[in-house]
Each structure stands twice: as structure tokens, then as C-alpha cells.
């Protein structure tokens, strides 16, 4: 359980460093260790875990994490999909389904597709942030790519994968993650250190 919470808090620390922080309560006006981007993610996550109550930790384990004002933690929505474009969020580009893109064997093209998806997702996330209430399908945390190897046609999510070839799935998965995260095709940051949109491979 501690490893699961540490993993979640590490992800939260990374997400929080990319968001505009909400105003801190009077008790949290000074810079706390978990807010210090110069510390490691593990140190920051452990510090944040030590400050959260059990009830707050429980609430943060859902796909909709409420704001925790006393610690300056903004509300966050963990659920967004981008298998072939930003999912269910108004007018965006819809690309072919994953299996069809895999049939191209063109990981450079897939990288370009997910760079475009990332651009659209960031624009949509900024729109949602202005409203002050980020809902499902409006965050920058994607449940993409699905890199499971598709070996059994009875599985209902096979069309979300890149097929049964491990080499192809590796190439396509890397292209998707690098495109979404704002990195170069070979995984190097384009500019400032960090990522623009984290991808959560399934």
C-alpha cells in the first residue's frame, strides 16, 4: 500500500509542478519541501504523504482529486483518454483507431499525430483551467497508449492496441509517449526539462 501511495504522490508532485498552484492557506504560506522543484520526486512525495490525513489520501486515490487548500493542492482530474485524439472533449481532431495506425508501421507519423494530440490537449486543458473546474476528459493525464500485446481476439480492447508484434508495439508506444510528452522523436526534451503532458501506458 505504501508503494502505491508513494507512486500516486510522485505522480501528483510532477502534476503539481506543471499546474498553476492555488493560493495557500495561511498555515502553508512558506515553501514546503513537497513544493520545492529542486528536490527529488521521492523526497517531495514522502513529504507530501506525511502532511496528508488518511481521509485526504483516500480522496486523492479517485480519478477526481479534490483541492486541499491547506496544502495548496489544486483540484485535479486524472481521467483523460487520447488513443486516437483527445477523447470526448468537444471539437478536436479524430485520428484513425490505434490498430489502423499500427498497420502503417510508421512510427514517425504516429509521433507527429501525438504531437498534434498533445497540442490540442494542452489548449483544451487551459480552457478548462480558466473555468476553475477541470472535469473528466479535460486534464493532461492520459490513459494512453495501450501497449498490451493483443493475442486473444476475445479481448474487448484489442482495437486499442498496436497488435501482437512486440517490436511494433514498442516502436509505436515510444512514438506516442514522446509525442504526448513534448519530447523529440528519440525521447530528448525539446526545450526546458520536464514533460508537457504525462502519458500513462496501460
Put a short name on every predicted segment.
Residues 1-4:
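Positively charged n-region of N-terminal signal peptides that target proteins for export
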Residues 24-202:
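Glycoside hydrolase catalytic-domain context in secreted enzymes
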Amino acid at each position: 500500500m505504501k508503494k502505491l501511495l508513494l507512486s500516486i504522490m510522485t505522480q501528483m508532485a510532477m502534476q503539481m509542478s506543471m499546474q498553476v498552484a492555488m493560493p495557500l492557506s495561511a498555515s502553508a504560506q512558506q515553501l514546503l519541501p513537497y513544493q520545492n522543484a529542486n528536490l527529488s520526486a521521492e523526497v517531495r512525495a514522502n513529504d507530501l504523504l506525511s502532511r496528508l490525513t488518511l481521509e485526504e489520501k483516500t480522496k486523492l486515490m479517485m480519478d477526481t482529486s479534490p483541492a486541499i487548500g491547506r496544502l495548496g493542492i489544486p483540484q485535479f482530474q486524472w481521467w483523460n483518454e487520447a488513443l486516437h485524439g483527445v477523447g470526448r472533449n468537444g471539437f478536436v481532431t479524430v485520428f484513425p483507431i490505434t490498430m489502423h495506425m499500427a498497420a502503417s508501421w510508421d512510427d514517425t507519423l504516429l509521433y507527429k499525430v501525438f504531437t498534434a494530440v498533445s497540442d490540442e490537449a494542452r489548449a483544451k486543458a487551459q480552457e478548462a483551467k480558466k473555468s476553475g473546474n477541470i472535469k473528466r476528459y479535460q486534464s493532461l493525464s492520459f490513459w494512453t497508449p495501450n501497449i498490451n500485446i493483443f493475442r486473444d481476439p476475445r479481448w474487448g480492447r484489442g482495437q486499442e492496441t498496436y497488435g501482437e508484434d512486440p517490436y511494433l508495439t514498442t516502436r509505436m508506444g515510444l512514438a506516442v509517449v514522446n509525442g504526448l510528452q513534448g519530447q523529440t522523436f528519440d525521447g530528448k526534451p525539446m526545450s526546458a526539462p520536464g514533460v508537457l503532458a504525462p502519458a500513462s501506458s496501460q
